[in-house]
Amino acid sequence: MSYQTIIEDNIDILVAGAGLGGTGAAFEARYWGQNKKIVIAEKANIMRSGAVAQGLYAINCYMGTRFGENNPEDHVRYARIDLMGMVREDLAFDMARHVDSTVHNFEEWGLPIMRNEKKGSYLREGRWQIMIHGESYKPIVAEAAKKSADKVFNRVCLTHLLMDESKKNRVAGAVGFNVRTGNYHVFKSKTVICGAGGASNIFKPRSVGEGAGRVWYAPWSSGSAYGLMIEAGAKMTQMENRIVLARFKDGYGPVGAYFLHLKTYTQNAYGEEYESKWFPALQEMVGKEYLDPEVSHRTHRPIPTCLRNHAIINEVNAGRGPIHMVTMEAFQDPHLEEIGWHNFLGMTVGQAVLWAATDVDPKYENPELTTSEPYVMGSHATGCGAWCSGPEDVSPPEYYWGYNRMTTIEGLFGAGDAVGGTPHAFSSGSFTEGRLAAKAACKYIDDGKAEGIRVSDAQINRRKEQIFKPLETYRVYSNEVVAGSVNPNFINPRQGLDRLQKLMDEYCGGFGVNYMTNDKLLNIGLKKMSILGEDLEKVAASDIHELLRAWELKHRFLTSESVFHHTLFRKETRWPGYYYRGDAMKLDDKNWHVLTVSRRDPETGEYTMEKAPLYHLVGDAETAPPTDHH
């Protein structure tokens, strides 16, 4: 196999992954680094990559401070309530205080944001969400990043970070391959900003067979944000905090616009309100501090997302499913009916197609909702990711080591899904985190922290051999296929993924076991994971596309292993409705009012787990009373 080796040298800032986090990093890096060499490497094409690829109908994170709507502290409180207390408040505050300027940039670049004609402010869907005509959201934002970067490498999948050989624990770039040509790409860089995606398809999905890939989170998000960093030895945090979504059944169309803008509501199969009956027992589990429906009703304090899921799961288990979204009332209004369909056509076309194909007209019947399989990510309503330094002006000493959004590996920064402890960033917040990381990366270089980096040819050649090994395995053993795809000497990526998903579902609390696990199941699962890890050394790829699938699988595996270790470590049920520890069914603030932190030793693969302090830096009092935003 004679694939070319293409070396890109003397890079100042390498942006790994060009979703919203990566595009934000490239854009801001040019502002602070006028003379710096900025390079983007993207697995797909920057114009339509990442979670926003097919558009969005709302920007879910906007303070509206210029309109007197909210302050950053308010958003920290909101995220803290929704995540059952588990938030890196320094990072969340830092993102929130800068996110509005990001949204104003988007509008300046041509993103159509709907306006409230009476107030002149943006049209609110909810307290934090603003409505957009966002089918072309990603191409608009990508243009700014393309103009900022010296080079954009599309179709290059990064598989490993390069490490400096002159100073331990310092990044030196990354390597990967072109998914079309197969060429080996080497990027030697002073800093790396990881803006790669979180992980879908690590738990067995509900959508299988002809529906495979119709999942809520981007199916191409293969946990590379975590795979790249875990493999290099970066510390991770809150990886147990997976997310389960209540969405329209089988198409996973979003429900936000329906609840907030169309004012629809849910009921069980028999037309009954069902949530409140589950709250007394749930309050026993989590405590009044986290669930107090009376206070929520009086103060508009939201009930945490996971607890609403808990009510759905239990109502269905009690035999009163399915849960329906009551659309028949709202859809009698032609304007609201149009918005309901537009909402999907601007961001989840598959849901509109599915309803049309299965004769579901929400004007005449109330569509079903379901809870999804779990996903692992750090920018929606959950906070998995790397343990990163916060900003110098608000972070306590345990959260600060010199440069904002820098991981525990020197010169390696994160944005979006890659950063742990910052939920509710969404698209605008991820772009903002990219900006913050880029500003810090420029300072890191200007402070002389990236001098004298050395990468040997031996490291580069070793990685090349490793990356292309699945092709070699296939070439050597492909003639020994027994039948179909069964081979005594290798497994293919699809077989490996099926195995991984089965393990995650049955042992780590997927939908197949009603999101339930315990210490015994997790330990058995970890044993089986280690055997799967051995077998992944024998994964085979018949072509370059399958090589991409093989490396996506390896990143998903590393992510999943981390999720297992974190879920085992946190001996409580912190987020009922996301998952349950059957051996510790209560929330336990006495022992677990902490953030979990892990590190995988790159040499041995062994995990060490620790507790990190959880500081509430923002007080409980509102700084701005919530007004009626509709």
Predicted stretch roles:
Residues 100, 107-160, 167-170, 238-426, ...:
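Mobile, glycine/GP-rich and aromatic-enriched active-site lid/loop segments adjacent to catalytic centers
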Residues 8-11, 181-191:
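Core beta-strand elements of the Rossmann-like FAD/NAD(P) dinucleotide-binding domain
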Residues 60-95:
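Glycine-rich active-site loop/strand segments that organize a redox cofactor
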Residues 447-542:
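Long, amphipathic alpha-helical stalk/connector segments used for oligomerization, subunit docking
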Residues 13-39:
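N-terminal Rossmann-like FAD-binding beta1-loop-alpha1 element of flavoenzymes
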